[in-house]
Amino acid sequence: MKETRKDIDFLKTIAIFSVIFYHFFDLLKSNLLSSVTLFEGGFLGVDVFLLISGFLICGSIVSKLNTDSFNLLQFYTRRVTRIYQPLLVFCAIILFIGYFILFPDIYKETGREVANAIIATANFRFANSTGYFDLESLDKVLLHTWYIAITIQFYLICPVILVSLKKIFKTNFNLSVLLFTTLLLITAFV
């Protein structure tokens, strides 16, 4: 059985409630109270989830690489199954219902969004379109798939980097991971 980390559970709880309260108070602001400013940054809870996921996945991979029990194919198979089964069902439902209720031009756009969701490039598509919080974004049923795309991209890249570091720096693997992470953080702020 997996060991639970209370500190990470606490961060997840804060992230969940910050997103929920953000949406709740945003709804109040747009419908009832125009001066409500509580939880304006609550959407950052999504970023916290990305960080937590990255931390946990990298930690798990590093741990398995240290014991030579990491299987890249098995890792990808589990992730693809976990992510793509519900995503494909959701996309099929959206396309089916959309066929009957959407205008043809919006349906075509939705079809393109479905394609981007499936090939994990929705984050690029939506980053180059309307703002996430703009009124036009209300028409984008798959706008939330930017998160799934980033997650998939991370799952594709992270294990390959870690496996490569393990092969290159056999004896100093943990140090190489630390140095790589440090360099990555430095470049993120430059």
Go through each PLM region and give its residues.
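Membrane-interface helix/loop caps of multi-pass membrane proteins
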Residues: 1-190
